[in-house]
């Protein structure tokens, strides 16, 4: 095997590993209840593959705190992350209710309709509302 073949084989292996890492990233990771900030994150592997995920934590004061925390997780998996926007989530598990609204001062407003679709994959039996009102 020549150097070019070895290099190509190595690249294919790295690409396969990053695709597997991307496939293993959960679509949703949010606090179990309460009102908290969230961010929509585009997670990107070493190639062209990507997926949008929702992250929201009640222990983070700023949207950037959420993104920074998750970006570190993705970097360890060999993935990149971009944040197109954020907002807030109201999560009431007793009522099986989620409300997605508001915006991030730092990242702008996330696509709440996209966020709703992603949340529905984890919470299919919930009522999920969106609103462009509020902060």
Swiss-Prot record:
Pfam family, one: Ocnus
A GO cellular component entry from the record: cytosol
Keywords: Differentiation, Sexual differentiation
Keyword set includes Cytoplasm: no
Active site (UniProt): 63
GO process annotations (BP): cell differentiation; sex differentiation
Keyword RNA-binding in annotation: no
Binding site for substrate: 37, 104-106
MF GO annotations: protein histidine phosphatase activity
Function: JanA and janB regulate somatic sex differentiation.
Family, as annotated: Belongs to the janus family.
Protein name (database record): Sex-regulated protein janus-A
């Amino acid at each position: 095997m020549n150097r070019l073949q070895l290099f190509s084989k190595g690249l294919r292996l790295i690409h396969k590993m990053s695709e597997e890492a991307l496939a293993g990233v959960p679509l949703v990771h949010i606090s179990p209840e309460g009102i908290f900030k969230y961010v929509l994150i585009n997670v990107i592997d070493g190639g062209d593959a990507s997926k949008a995920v929702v992250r929201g934590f009640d222990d983070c004061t700023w949207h950037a705190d959420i993104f920074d925390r998750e970006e570190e997780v993705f970097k360890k998996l060999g993935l990149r992350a971009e944040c197109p926007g954020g907002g807030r989530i109201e999560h009431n598990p007793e009522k099986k209710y989620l409300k997605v609204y508001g915006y991030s001062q730092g990242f702008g407003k996330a696509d709440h309709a996209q966020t709703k679709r992603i949340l529905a994959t984890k919470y299919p039996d919930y009522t999920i509302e969106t609103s462009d009102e509020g902060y």
